[in-house]
Every structure is written in structure tokens, then in C-alpha cells.
Amino acid sequence: MQSITIRNTVIGEGLPKIIVPLMAAGEKELLEEIEAVNRLRPDIIEWRADVYEHVDSLDAVKDMLEMLRKAAGATPLLFTFRTHKEGGNKVIDDRFYIELLKTAIETKHIDLADVELFTGEAEVKLIVKTAEDNGVYVVMSNHDFHQTPKKEEIISRLRNMQAYGAHIPKIAVMPQSTEDVFVLLDATHTMKTQYADRPIITMSMAGTGLISRLAGEVFGSACTFGAGKEASAPGQIPVEELRSVLSILNKHM
């Protein structure tokens, strides 16, 4: 598996990289939040644009990205609009979703862009091409907030992301039992050892799945999400606690 270096962050080697989301709705609050997040020393900062109150305006998004880029400094910036059907905050038209992603990418203020696998093959390939033309990496994602698919289905989705050109495939699933967490971890390990030629991100959500957010280095997930001011998904824990556990595991492996 090849690692990816974005600015000074190497994804796919050593400790899983910590991604911290920005979840504020307003401009002033976002700028205050990113300053607080910077103090946590994340490896990557994610802007959850589906929470932004002016996300319907492409000009407002471009202006906000310029400010966030400046505030993030040397820390890689991930742009994410999580659709409502995959757990996001806002319902938007599919065509606007694609236009929003293209606009964010073409500002060149971001380092990574999240695009959901089930947007459609042609659409995600268009986003991948746009990203590559602008020096941006693609995190291709899928989120199931209701269940954990079978191991074979999890692997199939990750392999499809890889085939569609994702630089970093990502899947998050909801466990209904401890056994479901084992399924996700087993699928992650199999994907990493048998199929992946690039970093992957996987997680089992909620408290039941917490171990998957902590043991990525063991099973093969290259990044994990920690809560800054506010968690963006069930099961995220504060960054300082997360970093401590990741460091302990890394030290004794």
C-alpha cells in the first residue's frame, strides 16, 4: 500500500492521522472554532459545509474557504458536504451537490474533497478528474447509519471506490452488536492486506464501535475522527484522549 503525503502529513504510515471537524453554522463561529481546533494540533481539519448557514451560495462558500485556508495554515483542509441521506444536516439537489464540490475544488483552497460513492459512477469520476486537475485528493465515502453490511459488501464498496479513482476510500457503518464491530474490523484487515493499494479509512460508529476508531494502526484504517468543539458522528471522542490511546498502541506494537 502506498502512502499519501499532503503538505507535511503522511497518510498511510505510522499512527492513524487525526481528522477534526468544524461544525459551526456561521462565519464568525467557524473562525472561532478553527482557532480552537488549531490548538488541538489535528493532522487534518474537515469543514462540514452541510452545517454552514450560507452553503446555498457558492460565492459565500468560496469566501469562507479562503478564510478557513488562511486560518488552517499548514494543516491539510478537507471539504465535506455530507448529504442528508448519509447523515448530513441539509437536503440539496444532486446537481447542486456536484457543482458545490467542483466549486470548492477549483478554489484550490482545499487539500482533500469528500465525495459520496453512491452519488453515481459518472458523477464521482467527474469529481475525481476535477480534483486531480486542481491538485486535490479525493476521499470517496459511504455511511450507513442503520446497519453494518456483510464483510463482502463492505469490501466491495471499498474496492469500487478504489476502481473509481478515490485516493482514500472511506466507509462508516453502524453496529447493532459487538459482532458487527468484528465484521468491520475483519473487512478492514482483509481490504488492506489483499486489495488496497492506497490508504483507507473505516470505522464502526457509536460507543459500541469505539475500538475501531482507536485501533486503526492494528487493522488498517489510516485516519480517525476526533471531536473538537462538537462531534460530527456518534462515537467520536475528544482529540487529546484519542491521541493518547493512539500513541500508547503505537509505542507497544
Swiss-Prot record:
- Report the top EC class in one word: lyase
List positions binding 3-dehydroquinate.
Answer: 46-48, 82, 213, 232, 236
UniProt keywords (A-Z) are: Amino-acid biosynthesis, Aromatic amino acid biosynthesis, Lyase, Schiff base
Q: Which residues form the active site?
A: 143, 170
Quote the Pfam families the UniProt record gives.
DHquinase_I
HAMAP family hit by this protein = AroD
The UniProt similarity line reads: Belongs to the type-I 3-dehydroquinase family.
Name this protein carries in UniProt: 3-dehydroquinate dehydratase
Q: Which organism is it from?
A: Bacillus velezensis (strain DSM 23117 / BGSC 10A6 / LMG 26770 / FZB42) (Bacillus amyloliquefaciens subsp. plantarum)
- Output the lineage of the source organism: Bacteria, Bacillati, Bacillota, Bacilli, Bacillales
